[in-house]
């Protein structure tokens, strides 16, 4: 491993070299596990400007961050997103600029994003049934999303991966079909355990929870799964399919197999809070530093370094019971 004297290290000697940045809390979908249907979004003055987002990215890269992922909300509804991607991708030392999307805007933006320097895309796809897709997203058009997926494939990204949040009784019967869809397009796919963020109304999380082990066991009835040591620097554990070597299946398991011991990431919310853990409220207000001391990169760097010592060893997600994290996923950075 290369040594960087500037590298960020937390209090448990974990190297932090991956930043997830939310560029907006807004989204053109209202997914049932992500936000309330009548979600009230932040006023413009409360969110970081594109320049402020860039300043944070620049300091993190100077401190050894090698991977940045832009998230939302839906990042592609933020005006100026392609230009922001171009500026961040050009930062010396950054190895990968990635982006997570619901796919709705990729038909028009996939190629510009690739040209700007985005190397990897994650695209959410929870169902292949148009009516069910609409029910899960409340507003989404499956045909439009599939067109976006195909546009991403044509653009030439280093890697395009599908993400599916599995909910028992709502879409768990589509697990095999989703993998076959990924195989047909030579894409990777990850199945994600639902995360207990925010108060939701459409289902009980304890009843809808579907573990990664359950998903994997069902897939093993149809495919030959071969465990892989490959990593994307994120939380997913990957398996190869003997029948389809071009497709990997990943499992993101915050409940059943938490990945806290090797956590290498922090999150920036669009309102400038640096979250040290997805499942805790530990945070540092970087917006205050940016606005009270504009252009002071040394002060911003110190705030980032000091924040690392607040990073807890692990989260304490619970499947059932009272919700402990009240912020919704779109406010966190999905």
UniProtKB/Swiss-Prot annotation:
Binds 2 [4Fe-4S] clusters. Binds 1 [4Fe-4S] cluster coordinated with 3 cysteines and an exchangeable S-adenosyl-L-methionine and 1 [4Fe-4S] cluster coordinated with 3 cysteines and the GTP-derived substrate. Residues 11-235 form the Radical SAM core domain. It is an enzyme of class 4 (lyase). S-adenosyl-L-methionine binds at residues 33, 73, 124, 195. One of its GO terms (molecular function) is cyclic pyranopterin monophosphate synthase activity. Keywords: 4Fe-4S, GTP-binding, Iron, Iron-sulfur, Lyase, Metal-binding, Molybdenum cofactor biosynthesis, Nucleotide-binding, S-adenosyl-L-methionine. Belongs to the radical SAM superfamily. MoaA family. This is GTP 3',8-cyclase. The lineage of its organism: Bacteria, Pseudomonadati, Pseudomonadota, Gammaproteobacteria, Pseudomonadales. The gene is moaA.
